[in-house]
Amino acid sequence: MLHVSMVGCGAIGRGVLELLKSDPDVVFDVVIVPEHTMDEARGAVSALAPRARVATHLDDQRPDLLVECAGHHALEEHIVPALERGIPCMVVSVGALSEPGMAERLEAAARRGGTQVQLLSGAIGAIDALAAARVGGLDEVIYTGRKPARAWTGTPAEQLFDLEALTEATVIFEGTARDAARLYPKNANVAATVSLAGLGLDRTAVKLLADPHAVENVHHVEARGAFGGFELTMRGKPLAANPKTSALTVFSVVRALGNRAHAVSI
């Protein structure tokens, strides 16, 4: 039985709790949320994980695993301290590692605690193939992300374009994965994940598009190197509760927790 604490109880966190509520091998003990959302979170947690308590911090709890489903801010506040205490962690908000020094802080904290932090693949596949290809040498990795125009509401794209007036797919960003994750942190976790598995944040090319006709989040990865080459296109349906997030992100967390808890993993 795997005892899990989770940071976050938004669309991703609730989706994870819902899918694992009947799994006897995964038990949620603590769900960590900001103080101003505790009442709302208690309602969801009582229905989906009645054995768990809602708190603002992990305090002296020592779960088998701490999983982050809360956004970039949670890494500094919750994940780094947990790693330093020797608690293994999983991270959904991989885009946070584009912030200067964050990747180094996570690694240093894990080393001090003698533990490990796992970066989850989220909405993209073939991360294992890309990471394996890096061993032999990669020459080029290009990531293109296409989302419904409304998914870019509240981002810098809204200041540059009239998203509601778009009539065709429009490139809203073209540059490095580091800049994509910095400018579009809630939309560019995939770009950061692809880059960290492959050529790195500064050598991975990224193009982001707002498409008024799109009903899915489309992720396309091209990679070439000593291994040969591959192209991957994924069409992910967004979460109903959060159009900025692919439903596959929730499923990737559930799979990762199952791999830790179950007798056989793949």
Curated annotation (Swiss-Prot):
Q: Spell out the catalytic residues.
A: H219
> Annotated pathway, please?
Cofactor biosynthesis; NAD(+) biosynthesis; iminoaspartate from L-aspartate (dehydrogenase route): step 1/1
Enumerate the Gene3D superfamilies for this protein. Dihydrodipicolinate Reductase, domain 2, NAD(P)-binding Rossmann-like Domain
The source's domain of life comes to Bacteria
Where on this chain does NAD(+) bind? A123, N189
What does the record give as EC number? 1.4.1.21
Which Gene Ontology BP terms does the record give? NAD biosynthetic process
Q: Name one Pfam family in it.
A: Asp_DH_C
Matching SUPFAM superfamilies:
Glyceraldehyde-3-phosphate dehydrogenase-like, C-terminal domain, NAD(P)-binding Rossmann-fold domains
- PANTHER family reported for this sequence: ASPARTATE DEHYDROGENASE DOMAIN-CONTAINING PROTEIN, L-ASPARTATE DEHYDROGENASE-RELATED
Q: What is the protein name for this chain?
A: L-aspartate dehydrogenase
At the highest ranks, the source species' classification is:
Bacteria, Pseudomonadati, Pseudomonadota, Betaproteobacteria, Burkholderiales
